[in-house]
Amino acid sequence: MTKKQLLGLIIALFGISMFLQIIGIGDLLFWPLFFLIAGYFLKKYSRDWLGSVMYIFAAFLFLKNLFSITFNLFGYAFAAFLIYAGYRLIKGKPIFEPNEKQVNLNKKEHHEPPKDVKHPDMRSFFIGELQMMKQPFDLNDLNVSGFIGDIKIDLSKAMIPEGESTIVISGVIGNVDIYVPSDLEVAVSSAVFIGDINLIGSKKSGLSTKVYAASTDFSESKRRVKVSVSLFIGDVDVKYV
């Protein structure tokens, strides 16, 4: 979806909302539509589980407005999360792991798994923060997802192996700050629905913003890090130290 299409969609939604307000049923649809759109962008740019929770939350809000159910924001959000978590567990999948394409195991049952397969460090939180700033840490592929909260990572503290390491961060509301040592080659891509992005000097702000930036010798470097950040509301700041 282009920015012009997105802007047109938002204007149309506000127009529909005003019309529904005039005829007396505006509150029935505005917030459900808002969270429905939020779910769409989260599933497009981020993890499926966050988008799915938003879809369920939008359905709860619609039913609440339709049947005048007592509103409890935390209760609805937590119930939406539990429904999705239960669905994932019933399907035999981890709660926070993104859906992956199924592999035909029959064709590979006689083959041993590759010995050089990386096992990413998976971290997630509902409300809180993640800081990797003070203590040294080994950087295998890192995958972080959160609902509400800030994330701060200092790569000068990281023990980075040769080759390409990846960091994938996704969230709904919060800020992401990543500090990069001057001798490390990085490539960073970020998508934010509402907020500011500053990627090693490339800045952009506004609505449905995307930025990509890479250091000059990234592709030739023996030790490099690729970073991907997706947020619904928040700021992303990746800078050299």
From Swiss-Prot:
Keyword Transmembrane attributed: yes
Location, primary (coarse class): membrane
Record note on disruption phenotype: Up-regulates expression of liaI which in turn induces the liaRS two-component regulatory system.
Induction behaviour: Induced, via the two-component regulatory system LiaS/LiaR, by antibiotics (vancomycin, bacitracin, nisin and ramoplanin), cationic antimicrobial peptides (human LL-37 and porcine PG-1), Triton X-100 and severe secretion stress.
Location in or out of the cell: Cell membrane
Matches recorded under InterPro entries: Cell_wall_LiaF, LiaF-like_C, LiaF_C, LiaF_TM
An annotated GO cellular component: plasma membrane
Protein name: Protein LiaF
Species in which this protein is naturally found: Bacillus subtilis (strain 168)
Gene: liaF
